[in-house]
């Protein structure tokens, strides 16, 4: 049985049952297991989304490129992954949950949520994580507007 992952990612109330330690350890564990080199992040407009973005970045080493695409719908993640060649996506959102909640959903390079077996492996690894100090160097990920420009070009071609 999974401790952190629910049906659709990890959800909770930030700084209560969804903590910096949990989120940073999850991303550090993801790096150990999936070995991503480029991570796309999108978020919703909840007050805690930028704080969770910081926590995510603290879990990844400085070898991982983290691109913050800002506020975009969840359905845009597969397009980002395919268009720009990221091999991991993270959506910061709690979907339909009340506004005090937030969470993270991990998306594989094919645009699908991670398989249960991988989530279980990540969870097993979380308890053994000790974040090295080098993992604090990505406090401000790059913002990338290529997706928005590409989307606008595609949209204009269609009309």
Report residues per predicted region.
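Active-site cofactor/substrate anionic-group-binding motifs, chiefly glycine-
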Residues: 62-72
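Gly/Ser/Thr-enriched, mixed-charge loops and adjacent short helices
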Residues: 13, 104-159
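An N-terminal, well-structured beta->alpha segment
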Residues: 1-63, 88, 137-159
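Short, ordered loop/turn segments at secondary-structure junctions
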Residues: 44, 71-72, 94-95, 111, ...
């Amino acid at each position: 049985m999974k401790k952190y992952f629910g049906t659709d990612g990890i959800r909770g109330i930030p700084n209560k049952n969804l903590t910096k330690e949990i989120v940073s350890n999850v991303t550090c564990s993801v790096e150990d297991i999936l070995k991503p080199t480029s991570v796309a992040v999108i978020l919703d407009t909840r007050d805690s989304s930028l704080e969770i973005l910081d926590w995510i970045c603290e879990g990844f080493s400085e070898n991982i490129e983290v691109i913050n695409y800002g506020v975009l719908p969840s359905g845009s993640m597969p397009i980002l992954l395919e268009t720009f060649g990221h091999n991991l996506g993270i959506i910061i959102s709690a979907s339909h949950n009340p506004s005090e909640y937030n969470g993270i959903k991990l998306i594989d390079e094919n645009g699908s949520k991670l398989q249960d077996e991988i989530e279980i492996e990540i969870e097993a690894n979380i308890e053994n994580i000790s974040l090295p100090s080098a993992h604090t160097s990505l406090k401000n990920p790059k913002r990338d507007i290529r997706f928005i420009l590409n989307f606008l070009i595609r949209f204009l071609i269609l009309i």
